[in-house]
């Protein structure tokens, strides 16, 4: 079973002297693969050491941006939706844990 990888990974594999086997996903498969990738990157963030957390969080952000673009949202539109939700329901700054 394969997984979605960053755009330059096939070239990096080729540069190491190996031949990558890959395909370009159809639109629906791409959306599903992005969702799977988001869960993968979130798990990696959770499991990362303190030193690796920034890099893993950047990976999560990259997948979120790709998902937004896939849904037709640019960063500005996504920020607007997030701001609207924050104004209606708040953020997470107060660290409230509901029992």
Which positions does each model-derived feature cover?
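Flexible "arm" and connector segments at domain edges
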Residues: 1-99
């Amino acid at each position: 079973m394969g997984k979605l990888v960053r755009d330059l990974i096939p070239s990096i594999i080729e540069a190491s002297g190996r031949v990558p086997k890959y395909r370009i996903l159809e639109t629906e498969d791409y959306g599903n693969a992005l969702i799977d990738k988001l869960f993968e990157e979130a798990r990696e963030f959770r499991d990362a050491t303190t030193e690796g957390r920034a890099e893993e969080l950047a990976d999560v952000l990259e997948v979120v941006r790709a998902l937004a673009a896939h849904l037709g949202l640019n960063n500005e539109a996504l920020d607007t939706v997030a701001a609207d939700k924050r104004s209606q329901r708040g953020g997470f700054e107060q660290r409230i844990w509901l029992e």
